[in-house]
């Protein structure tokens, strides 16, 4: 528009941000019409250490890495401790007898190496880490739990994880992917100390040990013949649990959150055509392709289409949770905008063909407000 704007630089090595928002579902997912969410994000990068923390109370992810040159000692903690009944859905109907409450807490520590890579911004590095893991799993009946549902015992968890990351991505003003790729993988082995007390039944596998592998690729780039304001964006995710070892308690959680941008958030599997919620899957492969247009220097519009193959949790008989293959698709129209008080807004409208509601298509809307301190 012929005017110049001076935007003060952001110290991306020292960031504190608050995200609050919510989603509305149409139709409902089971009995769920919508839900709020919020999280505090902290990132600090010093010469000899770094930390990255996402805190929401019931679900948290904390990491602190001590570095000496390219070597680092990695410490990591995560928990998923939702104090509400968790039920499976069939044809968008909650199967009440499957109701349980359960959660997991996991701590990890181990060595790693990290090297900076082009374009040498704070996110850009290649790292390989080997972590020992110790944690705890708990599960409890609710007033609605079927008498025949086998509930696993509370148990100690321990194992190891191999984690590799590469991030060569350049981000734009709103931290959205602009140019480059990021990729990585995880190989995770866990032993459930008391799982031999089970005999299969409604929980699936009776084996104590399981191996899971995941991988991802996220990218953004220009479109030949169009301006710098036009971007093509894509992401691909895959995950597999060792054969016969999947159950609802160790299944992957496929999320429908916004298109990934922040470096450590890239690895979390998402089906971008879906709304902001988790779906249990024993194995999955998903790909999303989109177009993003910079409407003004602070406003971006994205159009994204998604495809998903997955072995989704469903119910057999009255209360037996099993996994069945599904192939689904979805689409999202999203707007990212700068806002007052050093903040940004995210608004998205999504539709998908039945993975979220296990047999019934539908859509919804998500709104986020992100405040940078």
Write out the residue ranges for each language-model feature.
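Outer-membrane beta-barrel initiation region
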Residues: 1-78, 156-178, 194-196, 295
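C-terminal outer-membrane beta-barrel translocator/porin domains of Gram-negative envelope proteins
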Residues: 9-11, 157-322, 357
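Flexible, solvent-exposed coil segments and beta strand-coil junctions
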Residues: 13-14, 39-46, 85-95, 135-152, ...
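Transmembrane beta-strands of outer-membrane beta-barrel proteins
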Residues: 16-20, 49-55, 71-76, 122-132, ...
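Transmembrane beta-strands of outer-membrane beta-barrel pores
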Residues: 22-28, 57-61, 70, 77-83, ...
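Residues that define the transmembrane beta-barrel architecture of outer-membrane proteins
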Residues: 31-38, 56-60, 101-109, 154-160, ...
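Outer-membrane beta-barrel translocator/channel fold
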Residues: 69, 74-124, 136-148, 239, ...
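Outer-membrane beta-barrel "beta-signal"
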Residues: 335-344, 360-373
